[in-house]
Amino acid sequence: MKQKKESFVNHQIKSAILLTMDTIRVTLEPSQSGDAKNWKIANEGGEWPLTIIEVADHTIDLLLSKPYDFDQTNIVVCDSDTCYVEVRDVVRTDEFDDFFYYSGNDLGVTYTKEQTKVAVWAPIATKVNILLYKKWHDETGERYTCSRDGKGVWRAELDGDYESIWYLFEVYVNQSWRKVIDPYAKFLSINGQKAMIGDHAKTQLAQWPKLEPLSSPNDMIIYELHIRDFTIGRNNGIKHKGQFVGMTEEGTMDPHHLITGIDYLERMGITHVELLPVQEFGSIDESNRQDPNHYNWGYDTTHFFVPEGSYATDPYDGYSRNRELKLLIASLHKKQIRVIMDVVFNHLYIWEDSPLEQIVPGYFFRHTDENEMSNGTGVGNDFAAERNMARKMIVDAISYWIEEFHVDGFRFDLMGILDTETMKQVAKETKKATKDIFILGEGWDLPTSYPPELRAITDQARELPQIAFFQDRFRDGIKGSTFESIQPGFVSGNDFSIDEIVSGVRGSMELFSSPKQAINYVEAHDNHTLWDKLKEIHPHEETELLQKRHRLATSIVMLSQGIPFLHAGQEWFRTKYGCENSYNQPDWVNQFDWNQRAYFEKTVNYIRGLIKIRRAHPAFRMETYKAIKEHFHLMLVESDCIAYHLRNLGELDRWDDIIVIHNASLYKKRIPLPKNTDWYVVVDDHAASLIPLSKIGEDCVNVSPLSTWVCVNYKTK
């Protein structure tokens, strides 16, 4: 090595790149030819011949005569000319992936009072150190050398008690030193500047509440909310605004003496809260988190294993965020509400700066055939979950959140970017848990550089029977196109969406293996709220008519086969004042307006009534398509009205027969009912109740415009 350095300035060789496990591509300066024959590779262990296998314009492909030494700095030698070998394209080969796959479960930090062990997967690094700091803001650390194993894992053992010591890794990759955060870090400093060696026992709760069994995913009612939105408002009675612990506060009320916060969630009767991202994300300065203009949904993850610091009472404390998220989850469990995490594994925030790219350049992110960054996510990078160690990282993270934080489910953002094998491995891992874990995701078919037949998109749903998918076709059929703001749907005057409505209310059996795969919704954090969408379509319509359309849309979701999903505030016509994408808008756009909730308490109670009916009656949440085909009978299908009969329910339900009518017209509909039985109304245009609202005295029912009615009989019960 040393004798070659002085000739490096010759610059006849422009670059040397390791393409595969046995091939180096040399690029020559334009003034040079490829006539030279005497090619070698050299490192501190000696030098070995290279064989020319292909010559092209200013490039030569060279075949190695022995396995490449990944633990050495290598140079290509030709006569008096030399060039360092850059380990680059090879990391995206199957051979590299298989050779360096590490199946162990000790990546990151393993702490005891007697010894701390650290491990980082850095297969192309030739040197790795760990730097220890007494304070998170220290600039100079104490350096310890790590040793490498055959799978590219670098380790160090630190004798003594290193609890609450901060650390970074220092890796030497492609002739460059880089200081990086541990990708498997479990505790972080403010803004994730350093990782902390922590004792998990210091964040454990004395006892976790016991959850009552949930017999089936079909029993779920999901309620999606953002930590800051839900707690930041001035009129909610919550003290710890914008923080995890704000959602643990009981007994909070608004100025109208109506309950708020976690008590409100319990009163609604939902079974699951889906939290928008709580993994550490990069767009918020955690030291300035109370600024009302300093807001983000959090879909810009930087660390897979650590909670977001801006929601902690003290983001400078490495333990605070972990302890307080656990307290939040336990508080919801106490109310018998399960927790779904919205996880972002499809991309990373500023990929160039991520520790994954710094440690193993080119491995963790998907590339096109032209070696450009794949960008199906639309944010500059796609995570290459199909690679062994990327997939392992996702599965490890899921396992960690279940075991350490008692999470009950995961919503995979842009799941269609990820591959089906990864999602199968995730589902398999969740089966190891001591409780049922629910997985759902966005199965959008996005333009990433990976074959669609191998990705977790809706068209592959039958390959993933344990995973649920957002049913966007039903969504758009109900309210109109999400991406064309003025295009109407069933509830707003579209005569051509009835087929999607019929499919959706039956559980979307054309798409899925079972009803539990269908996530039915009309509103989520993305895009316009339902209210704002309806205002776009009908800008001059009376408020009362808009409210009827809104209630109709929500009632369709709540009564359909599959799993209903509500966006927080949907039950009281939540608005974001026309903002179509509020991901970084100020609090006044995104926050929960509890005054509006109070004003529309009657509608809140209407949705609560639908929730009670659904939870009390299995006929609305049948387990199989076989059962749906047996009991579901279409009575009427018109462009603006659908009526169906859930019949012969027998032992399935306390009600013998149920008739559901969704009238999207501006006129009253007269719907015939089966004769020779007593029919009772439990849902009309004003109320939804387990106790009948009225008895129907004839063989038909007059259904009000823009409303849902449910009629039942229970003659044998």
Roles of regions detected by a PLM:
Residues K2-S15, T20, A56-K117, D138, ...:
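The feature marks proteins involved in alpha-glucan
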Residues A122, E163-Y167, L693-K717:
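C-terminal beta-strand-rich structural cap/linker in extracellular carbohydrate-active enzymes
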Residues R228-F405, M415-L418, M423-T434, F438:
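Substrate-binding/active-site clefts of carbohydrate-active enzymes
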Residues L28-A36, W121-K127, S665-L666, K675-T677:
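Short proline/glycine-enriched turn/loop motifs at strand-loop junctions of beta-rich domains
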Residues E29-W48, T126-K134, G141:
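Short, surface-exposed alpha-helix to beta-strand junction/turn motifs within ectodomains of secreted
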Residues L546, L559, F600, L610-I611, ...:
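C-terminal accessory region downstream of the catalytic core in glycan-modifying enzymes
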Residues N191-K202, A427-F573, Y577-Y583, Y625, ...:
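Conserved alpha/beta catalytic core and glycan-binding cleft of carbohydrate-active enzymes
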Residues V120, F169, L225, L275, ...:
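Conserved, mostly hydrophobic/aromatic
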